């Protein structure tokens, strides 16, 4: 597949590289941590958008693949001594004990491959169904992965999780990999495979009648999405330096769903905008979780309500679905917006 660089893509690339290199100088530790989270969620969102938005398959599996990637990368990076120290109740299996590498890139590749291989196997089951049934099957997959993480302590250390993971996820790694992920997804979207994915989204039966191998194309989108979600999970583990089953519940999938719907299903640019609004906004609205309101004259006493900010985002999602059903960008990309501005500018000059 030939790499295509449009003017808008070049602008995005240059602006992103500049932002990555100046971030350590303009943000404190807390701000830099949020920027790292945004970069990782961009990877997760654009990859999830490939299967859900571009290909039109209503899948609810991201938390499962992110969990697999996080655990796979962690088990590669932890030394044998660190594993023995942490698996103090149920010793690690001999295979888990033997796995070790200090290579961060290798750990991310292993994380991506593990998720992608499982996606290939899962595709034979999930793509026998469509629509709501597909959503239910993939939702079940995420739940199974979380339960497996709890009930296989010799592999995952169970509910105790794993800690002291090397913190490799600096802004240079997370930002750089996010750029690579975005460029990869954009090149897929604008390739013949991307056109086939869009045809399946618009009308799968018609796409099949035109000679498109719908199962193969959906599997390609699913496995590519899973690879990036797995790598993103590895990055997340190395940012937080800890993994546990509770980190990978359905809330993660729901958050990604809000992001791509808000930005516009099928738009990579929209997914990026959605990440900035949701992740950045959720940090800005963190005060809502700790909000205490007491007005004696009204006999009103509201104590802190954990999760209130997610209620706010749920309301935002409902409003978007009601008044802007295609999201902020719809199906459009940054290049389409620039093209539209150029056309209007030319018309105004005539």
Task: Kindly label every feature range from the protein language model.
Residues 1-350:
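Transmembrane alpha-helices and adjacent helix-loop boundaries
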